[in-house]
Amino acid sequence: MGSCINEEKLAKFFQRSLNALPAPYTSGLPNHLSLIFFVVSGLDLLNKTDILEKEKQDIINWVYSRQILPSKDNPEINLENCGFRGYNFLGQEFCCDKSVHTSENGPLEYDLPSTPNTYCALLILRILGDDFSGVNKKAIIDSLRKRQRESDGAISGSPNVGDYDLRHLFSACAISFILDDWSAINKESAIDYIKSCLSYEFAFGQTPQQEAHGGPTYCAIASLSLLGRLDVLEPFKEQLTFWLVKKQITGFCGRTNKDPDTCYAFWIGASLMMIDRYDLIDFASINAFIGSAQHEAIGGVAKEPGQLPDVMHSYLSLVGLSFGNIPSIQQVIPCLNLSKRAAGKDWFEKLI
């Protein structure tokens, strides 16, 4: 089966988005690395990375400029604040060709890394063929070590910030897998936290006692997959499967009694892929729904038909289509959200 989207138009949409974004994206600049990841990985899935050949080294340099390192004079200073930030903020010197070392006085107050930005930075570098020689792996792992809460195993997104939830636990697991160092995470405590987020619907909320939602459910299952502990799902796997399959209307929705949204082709689709139940859904309907949400003139995919497209929905829709084994789209490793081509044999074999 072929895709219902115009792949050439989508590739041009990603290419334009790399160079300029409309004003509404301004509020997303704290997560700028995720926007670049959507574009770069989207072109990778479409087999169009040749488009990036001229800009490739500039993108790699830009990603490294987002890295926050320990003090150059004393590597033990500021270990809790290392990783990748999304973008430059007030008071931080703009520098587009080298990573930033913090001063002896510590980091600027609002210049913080986050686990999602670090995860996206590492994936961008992998897709573009970087060898990670500029990544301070020790500093990232040492910083990550300070993020896990002892009381329940939850992990925060940034140093001294109280947003503990499954998004950041997943990002931490992905970072640990990518850097091949799990020493920062108490695995059993992390698994206990995942279990605590299970709702009465037998899917997962973002934090304990929250409504089951497609995004956190993906984060929970992907974390367990990276941890090698999908067996945790066995006692309620059939109920979880039922909840996931029932999210399909034409496309998937993310919560019970909500309208379909193209991004859940990834969140729900990848969850079903990881538990080996994707054969239970109607892929032709998913394909058609995504095709109907592609903007004829702009080329990107919106959250639903008739809306304006954006890079997130365009990318996650494309990943959702990859689960249908469409020949023109690269296959994706669901638990990493990365093409098998970019992952390479070394990462892929560790996940089998």
UniProtKB/Swiss-Prot annotation:
PFTB repeats lie at residues 135-180, 187-228, 236-276, 283-325. Its cofactor is Zn(2+); Mg(2+). It comes from the Eukaryota. Belongs to the protein prenyltransferase subunit beta family. It catalyses: geranylgeranyl diphosphate + L-cysteinyl-[protein] = S-geranylgeranyl-L-cysteinyl-[protein] + diphosphate. Keywords: Magnesium, Metal-binding, Prenyltransferase, Repeat, Transferase, Zinc. GO terms for cellular component: CAAX-protein geranylgeranyltransferase complex. GO terms for molecular function: CAAX-protein geranylgeranyltransferase activity; protein geranylgeranyltransferase activity; zinc ion binding. Zn(2+) binds at residues 261, 263, 313. Gene3D superfamilies: 1.50.10.20. Catalyzes the transfer of a geranyl-geranyl moiety from geranyl-geranyl pyrophosphate to a cysteine at the fourth position from the C-terminus of proteins having the C-terminal sequence Cys-aliphatic-aliphatic-X. The gene is pggt1b. The keyword DNA damage does not apply. Binds 1 zinc ion per subunit. Heterodimer of an alpha and a beta subunit. This is Geranylgeranyl transferase type-1 subunit beta. Geranylgeranyl diphosphate binds at residues 213-215, 255-258, 264-267.
